[in-house]
Amino acid sequence: MSFRGGRGGGFRGGRGGSRPFTPSGPPDQVIELGLFMHDCEGEMVCQSTNVKIPYFNAPIYLENKSQIGKIDEVFGPMNQVYFTVKPSEGIVSSSFKVGDKVYLSGDKLIPLDRFLPKPKTVGPKKPKGARNGPAGRGGRGGFRGGRGGSRGGFGGNSRGGFGGGSRGGFGGGSRGGSRGGFRGGSRGGFRGRF
């Protein structure tokens, strides 16, 4: 899961998105964002320790508010977020040690619930039998055919089977045919009588 371009203008602009950062000095206060894990192709790979998601391109600092780079990418599952930092000029990613903390300004974070699906509103209940739509006309839960069609099967004349004529089989066989394998048994059964 990548958070780039999230809903409502993610990390690359758009309505409510991040604006281009202009050099304005360090923020009044920085908060911990995550821990350095390792470097990869000249960038810092870090694990987030914050419950919120950082903006793309947000400036990253040390605890003393000296800027070391900017967020390049955010990835991973919702409950274990990672991010990469593109170091500023003169900063070498391999010079950091595992567990070193990185910080950012608190106004460069997005609440996690912005990325979670909204709960569905409960609508009026559908009339009985409306779930299968016009395809189930006349049958008892069947997918096609009228009164003489299938009664729960996917095709043919089966009464609960997936195809063919058996009363509960996966395929083939009339009522008087073979009852072995997956074909026989009670209506809607899967095992049959051997």
Curated annotation (Swiss-Prot):
Its main location: nucleus. InterPro entries: Gar1/Naf1_Cbf5-bd_sf, H/ACA_rnp_Gar1/Naf1, Transl_B-barrel_sf. Residues 1-25, 115-194 are annotated as: Disordered. Residues 4-17 are annotated as: RGG-box 1. GO terms for biological process: snoRNA guided rRNA pseudouridine synthesis; snRNA pseudouridine synthesis. It is found in: Nucleus, Nucleolus. GO terms for cellular component: box H/ACA snoRNP complex; nucleolus; nucleus. It comes from the Eukaryota. The keyword Cell membrane does not apply. Keywords: Nucleus, Repeat, Ribonucleoprotein, Ribosome biogenesis, RNA-binding, rRNA processing. Gene3D superfamilies: Probable tRNA pseudouridine synthase domain. Pfam families: Gar1. Belongs to the GAR1 family. Non-catalytic component of the H/ACA small nucleolar ribonucleoprotein (H/ACA snoRNP), which catalyzes pseudouridylation of rRNA and is required for ribosome biogenesis. This involves the isomerization of uridine such that the ribose is subsequently attached to C5, instead of the normal N1. Pseudouridine ('psi') residues may serve to stabilize the conformation of rRNAs. The H/ACA snoRNP complex also mediates pseudouridylation of other types of RNAs. The H/ACA snoRNP complex mediates pseudouridylation at position 93 in U2 snRNA. Component of the small nucleolar ribonucleoprotein particles containing H/ACA-type snoRNAs (H/ACA snoRNPs). This is H/ACA ribonucleoprotein complex subunit gar1. It comes from Schizosaccharomyces pombe (strain 972 / ATCC 24843) (Fission yeast).
